[in-house]
Amino acid sequence: MLIDRRKFLSLTAAAIAAPAFAAEGAAHGQIVTLPKFGPDSVSTSRIRIWLPPDYSEGGSSYRTLFMLDGQYAFAEDSDGVNFAADRRVARLAATGTIEPTLIVAIDNLEEDRFLQYMPQTIYDRTDAGVRAVIEGEINRVGKTALVSAQFIRFLATQLKPYVDTYYRTRPDRLDTAIFGASMAGVMAGSIFVEAQQSFGLGACMSPNWPIYNKQMIDYPELAAVWAAYFAQLGRPEGRRLWLDHGTQMMDAGMAPHQSAIAHRLTDLGWRRGCNLQTRVYDAGHAYAETATQMDEMLAWLLA
């Protein structure tokens, strides 16, 4: 049975509007909007970079955090309903909890968000049951194909090199993070796997592993595909991956998939608390407890 999309969207909107979503403190630093990269759909989204308060004062190089669903990244976005990542990173860096970090916020494709964030590789590797679910979502928006493979390629071969060229970054993968929530959390995991030469720090907040479908929660084929997919990471080699989900709403259905992924990674040498952090929050989907999740995630991932 499909999760009713109108109900899902209303629950998500309510969760986004929760008071816990805002971060305290004034915004600092500078936000720069990048020029458009090209005519294709995956590279025409608005992309902004947040520069830390001291960026213009010296010659230091910075870590970089790439954020999906970028229109909700900063404290002044979406009428205050946002991740407030600029405030959080500035505050955590000021206290020495994390290293100073640039933020690259990439807006989603709105109605085509699912096409952008559902991994093509998972569609290609799974069985007819899972493919039918994915095709149903593609048909719902009146399209014929995913664009996620193109999006990953754009990030790895165009956007990241551009940022590393024109801004003072530390380009090594161990200084480059990718973050997303819900379906963007799924895509953050895919970028971490498929562009692992570029992204060595990853965070998947409430990732929608079951693809909006209740039948996929305990569907062993899908959990096995996710686990095998992440096994492509091999040994950690200094990388870090954060996985979390809640216990309420649709988040409760993410547990089997997160468990399968985590077990496969620990078999490959990923140590919990060191290379791999898995959290379960007594909360609903993605945004409802962002004040807690975001601060804990940033403090661990960017320490």
Each PLM stretch: what is its role?
Residues E24-A303:
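Non-catalytic cap/lid and distal C-terminal segments of serine-dependent acyl enzymes
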Residues K7-E24:
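N-terminal export signals
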Residues M1-I3:
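Secretory targeting signals
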